[in-house]
């Protein structure tokens, strides 16, 4: 997903059977801090959940459950887009930080709905990209399961080969 959204280089991928997988990525600095960049980040963070739904036809709690999970990070990012980054659909010029978004969601159901809407849009976008790039997705998944870990050169070769395929 990181590659498909042109967020920067993918430096490696790994599967850790005890803790799940992880990726090592870089980011292009020329495109950060725009609404599009933040929406791409949300899409990237929701991609694992979208992949589970597409491949397994169900989702696990793997995308959530902890404060550093993809779901927690995406929720915080969507919250910040609404409240502190100037991209909110309501009062975008007000800077309204908060340490605990969950407490705010309990008091402001409209804000919770807007944040949830951003997460749903990112999930839908991730699923659409994965469907469109299914051969690349499958090639990466197969290679990763076979190797358990891949460096930047290996990942880049798979992405390049898939991008060149008709």
Which functions belong to the PLM regions below?
Residues 2-166:
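Soluble catalytic regions of large protease machineries
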């Amino acid at each position: 997903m990181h590659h498909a959204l042109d967020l920067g280089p993918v430096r490696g991928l790994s599967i850790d059977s005890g803790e799940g997988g992880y990726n090592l990525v870089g980011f292009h600095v020329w495109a950060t801090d725009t609404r599009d960049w933040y929406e791409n980040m949300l899409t990237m963070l929701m991609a694992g959940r979208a992949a589970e739904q597409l491949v397994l036809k169900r989702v696990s709690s793997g995308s959530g459950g902890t404060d550093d999970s993809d779901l927690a990070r995406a929720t915080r990012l969507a919250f910040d887009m609404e409240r502190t980054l100037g991209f909110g659909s309501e009062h975008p010029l007000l800077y309204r930080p908060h340490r605990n978004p969950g407490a705010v969601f309990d008091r402001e159901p409209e804000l919770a709905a807007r944040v949830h809407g951003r997460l749903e849009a990112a999930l839908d976008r991730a699923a659409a990209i994965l469907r469109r790039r299914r051969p690349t997705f499958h090639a990466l998944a197969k290679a990763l399961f076979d190797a358990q870990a891949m460096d930047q050169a290996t990942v880049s070769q798979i992405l390049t080969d898939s991008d060149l395929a008709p």
